[in-house]
């Protein structure tokens, strides 16, 4: 009924059925109880990939029963440091201690806050688990 009203009143075609998900699914996939699914920024659990790496932030989180999750922001490998710092501050506003980032540069090298603590194989496994490629 609401879909018909929208179409009749303002010409907006509502695609049915409307996607629904449980609170638990929303929190697990997007980290929010009101996710914006338009952009595909789903959390990827990489806990198994980083479980034995030398980066204390990751291993500490796992030892305390937490998880390590990431978001692949396609095509943003060359995001300016100022913007990354703004994202860190945004995350801190929601209770995070910080953010770790890994960019795969167009030439295949890595720009990261933690790459020096991981082997090349671990970094490749992490990029693969995240569905990353050069430029991400």
Can you describe what each PLM-predicted range is?
Residues 1-136:
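Class II aminoacyl-tRNA synthetase catalytic cores and aaRS-like
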